[in-house]
Amino acid sequence: MEVNILAFIATALFISIPTAFLLIPYVQTATQSN
């Protein structure tokens, strides 16, 4: 089964970008609480 590199990149961006938007405020609040 051949892996389409563009589809892999699109999927990685589609997963990582919303995760970053959720993770960045969480890390900021976690660091400020200490």
Curated annotation (Swiss-Prot):
This is Photosystem II reaction center protein M. It is found in: Plastid, Chloroplast thylakoid membrane. NCBIfam families: PS_II_psbM (TIGR03038). It holds the Pfam family PsbM. Its main location: plastid. The gene is psbM. The chain crosses the membrane at residues 5-25. Keywords: Chloroplast, Membrane, Photosynthesis, Photosystem II, Plastid, Reaction center, Thylakoid, Transmembrane, Transmembrane helix. It is a single-pass membrane protein. One of the components of the core complex of photosystem II (PSII). PSII is a light-driven water:plastoquinone oxidoreductase that uses light energy to abstract electrons from H(2)O, generating O(2) and a proton gradient subsequently used for ATP formation. It consists of a core antenna complex that captures photons, and an electron transfer chain that converts photonic excitation into a charge separation. This subunit is found at the monomer-monomer interface. GO terms for biological process: photosynthesis, light reaction. PSII is composed of 1 copy each of membrane proteins PsbA, PsbB, PsbC, PsbD, PsbE, PsbF, PsbH, PsbI, PsbJ, PsbK, PsbL, PsbM, PsbT, PsbX, PsbY, PsbZ, Psb30/Ycf12, at least 3 peripheral proteins of the oxygen-evolving complex and a large number of cofactors. It forms dimeric complexes. InterPro entries: PSII_PsbM, PSII_PsbM_sf. HAMAP family: PSII_PsbM. It comes from Psilotum nudum (Whisk fern).
